[in-house]
């Protein structure tokens, strides 16, 4: 992350939450692929790490910001939170089954993102999985809202991707089985993937819409997109 940007305590406190829908959907991926050892890169306040630790997994987190490390260390097991840059991960080769980076790569320069993917590939085990969420530069709402688009609202967002550009980048860094349409946890309240105009619709309809926005072709048109890839054997 660029050192000149203001990642202070207020920044991380404002974002001190866990989207349970993301956590449970990621848990489905972990269980279906029998993954045990997890690293959350850009872990922020550490809520996702804590979620997986409580679920019985060997979960770790890293962030390069002091305030994030202080917050994450308070709620997670001793020795599981590390101060580190995404572009220089201090872990052994082939040491993790899953690497997640939730709303992280938009904070990196293009060069840092390239280094992060190399580092992720290095420390993933054979057939290990990388899971990313980032703002979608191809979102219809970006074209409709212009400068008011949510991706622009955070000045620490410096690099943007579309599902296609990130797919190509992952492929260049030797990842395989790249997917942006994923199985989603169902029946978990969330407004995260829906336009504000439909936040008040009945919960059954909202659940169906959320599912479609992740597991159908609509996934590539959300404001933020999910993408998963695997280290080749």
Listing of model-derived features with the role each one plays in the protein:
Residues 103-107:
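Short catalytic micro-motifs in class I SAM-dependent methyltransferases
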Residues 108-109, 124-126:
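Helix-to-beta-strand junctions that scaffold the AdoMet/dcAdoMet cofactor pocket
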């Amino acid at each position: 992350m660029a050192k000149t940007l203001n990642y202070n305590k207020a920044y991380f406190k404002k974002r001190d939450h866990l989207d349970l829908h993301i956590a449970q959907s990621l848990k489905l991926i972990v269980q279906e692929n029998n993954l045990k050892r997890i690293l959350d890169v850009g872990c922020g306040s550490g809520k996702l790490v804590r979620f997986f630790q409580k679920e019985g997994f060997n979960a770790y987190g890293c962030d390069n910001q002091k305030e994030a490390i202080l917050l994450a260390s308070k709620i997670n097991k001793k020795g599981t939170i590390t101060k580190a840059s995404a572009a220089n991960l201090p872990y052994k080769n082939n040491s993790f089954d899953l690497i997640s980076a939730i709303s992280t790569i938009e904070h990196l320069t293009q060069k840092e993102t390239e280094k992060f993917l190399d580092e992720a590939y290095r420390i993933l085990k054979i057939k290990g999985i990388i899971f990313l969420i980032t703002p979608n530069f191809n979102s219809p709402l970006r074209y409709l809202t212009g400068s008011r688009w949510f991706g622009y609202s955070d000045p620490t967002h410096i690099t943007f991707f579309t599902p296609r550009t990130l797919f190509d980048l992952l492929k260049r860094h030797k990842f395989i089985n790249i997917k942006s349409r994923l199985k989603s946890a169902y029946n978990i309240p969330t407004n995260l993937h829906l336009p504000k105009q439909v936040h008040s619709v009945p919960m059954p309809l909202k659940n169906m819409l959320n599912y479609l926005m992740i597991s159908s072709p609509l996934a590539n048109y959300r404001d933020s997109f999910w993408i998963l890839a695997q280290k080749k054997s």
